[in-house]
Regions:
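An aromatic/glycine/proline-enriched structural segment found at the starts
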Residues: 35-44, 204, 208, 212, ...
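C-terminal regions of mature proteins
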Residues: 33-49, 241-243, 392-500
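A structural supersecondary motif
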Residues: 89, 299-303, 323-365
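M16/MPP (pitrilysin/insulinase) zinc-metallopeptidase core fold and M16-derived inactive scaffolds
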Residues: 80-145, 210-212, 326-341, 353
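Bacterial N-terminal signal peptides
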Residues: 14-27
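M16/insulysin-pitrilysin zinc metalloprotease superfamily fold
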Residues: 109-115, 145-176, 325-326, 350-408, ...
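Short acidic/His-enriched helical or mixed secondary-structure segments at domain edges of catalytic enzymes
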Residues: 178-197, 276-296, 333-342, 387-438, ...
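Scaffold signal of the M16-like zinc-metallopeptidase fold and its non-catalytic homologs
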Residues: 34-41, 111, 154, 186-237, ...
Length: 500
């Protein structure tokens, strides 16, 4: 699927903006002049005195009932629009897996009423603009970038893409061929295998796995009529949230948006419920047969939590110390810095809004050292569950999160997109106002408590993508073997076209 890209003019502006922000957002360290600390853990942060903007200052209700977040930015002669759409591949029928993605692609690349796809491309190119459509698991996003002087014409094109796609059959046939070719190659990259098999192990037949369940049969079954029905179901004004920034006057852009949506029929959206609870998977060691590689991808974890749990801030700090904080985190130090086993390692709590996410730790290494590296991670998980962290370590982790609170508000465009996303996901209006205070309140006792509450060594699932024979042999330098961690199940690599 074609992703949003900024034209040459936009890239120049973006680069200048990025460089300026890089200077503005460098953390202010409290160290004596000329003093160089011997380790990042010893960096001291000055108090950040920053008050995030409030969503109510950017929010507007359009005539049709849709919400728009807008910010004037006369310094840059551009217009940027994002339209969030409450939809996603989680809501498509399993037997039509791939429908949401193909609908989004054809909205942009299958022509619109009165224009072929080539004619639409030409008009957008003449404006030095860009329009993209992307429908992923839990949302759709339609984006526009153009010069502000071309706003009227560009918004008219955006309206055509949103309201009047024709889903040209020839374009559908071409894209279907591309998708089938992509499926044929889905086992070539071990990253794809790892992600897919992790979803299946963790979630079984939960709707969140549908994006990974495209098959030759499901893709071939998708018709133009399916796309028309999918578009009609989800693309209507009250199901949109707008994020708009650029060189305009507020009253003018609101009038343009109202005009764009006028006369467009609405209806009530009936989203299929997404189960928020999932059963815990069976603990054990699962080895996916991929014998033509010389390294293993290793992931271990279990079912975790949703986004808005009461102790989310302590959880952020705890995982930052464990494996989410880059080179200062314990897993990265042990696996990469101390032992040199992997270039990339870490841990993360994925925290979706609609259902429980997962805790996962990961690294990639030679087959022989996989069990040794896994044991190092287990040691760190046990350590953070049983030993209270030093207050200084906790304070440094907190300071990092607090200093980054400016990032969602670094430009006018990021401000409105942050608030549109928060609106879409139901985040409280005062979330950012209270963010720093809530992070500051986290104590070493809180870190220990959430580690004990949300890390479950007895529920761990171990996923290894690599050559099972080589992985199980291990290393003569280390005694650890994957059989130490649970019962081993060898899982044949799925057929890329059928997933059987």
């Amino acid at each position: 699927m074609k992703l949003f890209s900024i034209p040459l003019f936009g890239r120049s502006v973006a680069l200048a903006t990025t460089l300026a922000l890089a200077v503005m957002l460098v953390p202010v360290f409290d160290a004596a002049a000329g003093e160089i600390v011997d380790h990042p853990d010893n960096l001291k942060y000055k108090e950040l005195n920053y008050k995030p903007p409030k969503p109510k200052d950017y929010r507007h209700e359009l005539d049709c009932g849709a919400t728009a977040y807008e910010a004037e930015n006369p310094e840059v002669p551009t217009l940027q629009v994002t339209v969030l759409v409450r939809t996603g591949s989680m809501y498509e029928p399993l037997e039509k897996a791939g429908l949401a993605d193909m609908t989004g692609y054809l909205m942009r690349n299958g022509g619109v009423k009165g224009m072929t796809a080539s004619e639409l491309d030409e008009k957008i190119a003449m404006l030095a603009g860009e329009i993209s459509v992307n429908i992923r698991s839990d949302r759709g996003a339609v984006t526009l970038f153009c010069l502000s002087k071309d706003a009227d014409e560009a918004l008219a094109l955006l309206k055509s893409v949103l309201r009047n796609p024709v889903f040209d059959q020839a374009a559908l046939d071409r894209y279907r061929t591309d998708v089938l070719s992509e499926l044929e190659q889905r086992n070539a990259d071990t990253r794809n295998i790892e992600t897919r098999e992790w979803q299946f192990l963790m979630y079984g037949d939960h709707p969140c796995t549908i994006p990974y369940r495209r098959t030759e049969q499901s893709v071939k079954s998708i018709t133009r009529e399916d796309m028309i029905a999918f578009h009609k179901e989800y693309f209507f004004p009250k199901n949109f949230i707008f994020a708009v920034s650029g060189d305009f006057k507020t009253k003018d852009i609101l009038a343009q948006l109202n005009g764009m949506l006028a006369g467009w029929p609405d209806h009530e959206l009936a989203l299929a419920p997404i189960p928020d609870q999932v059963p815990d998977p069976i603990p054990g060691v699962y080895m996916i047969e991929k014998e033509d590689v010389n390294q293993s991808r290793i992931r271990l974890g279990h079912i975790g939590v949703r986004r808005d749990i009461p102790d989310q801030y302590a959880l952020l700090v705890m995982n930052d110390i464990l494996g989410g904080g880059g080179f200062t985190s314990r897993i990265v130090r042990r696996v990469r810095s101390d032992e040199g086993l992997a270039y990339s390692a870490g841990s993360r709590f994925d925290r979706p809004v609609l259902y429980r996410g997962t805790f996962r730790a990961w690294f990639q290494t030679k087959h022989a050292t996989g069990a040794f590296g896994t044991d190092l991670i287990l040691i760190e998980i046990d350590r953070i569950r049983t030993e209270k962290c030093d207050e200084e370590i906790v304070e440094n982790a907190k300071a990092s999160f607090i200093s980054n609170v400016v990032n969602p508000f670094s430009t006018k465009n990021t401000i409105v997109n942050t608030f549109a996303d928060d609106d879409y996901t139901g985040r409280a209006d005062d979330y950012w106002q209270n963010y720093a205070k809530n992070v500051k309140a986290v104590t070493p006792d809180d870190v220990l408590a959430v580690a004990q509450k949300y890390l479950h060594p007895d529920k761990l699932v171990f996923l290894i993508v690599g050559d099972p024979k080589a992985v199980q042999v291990g290393s003569d330098k280390h005694e650890e073997r994957f059989s130490d961690f649970g019962e081993i199940t060898i899982v044949p690599l799925r057929d890329p076209m059928t997933l059987e």
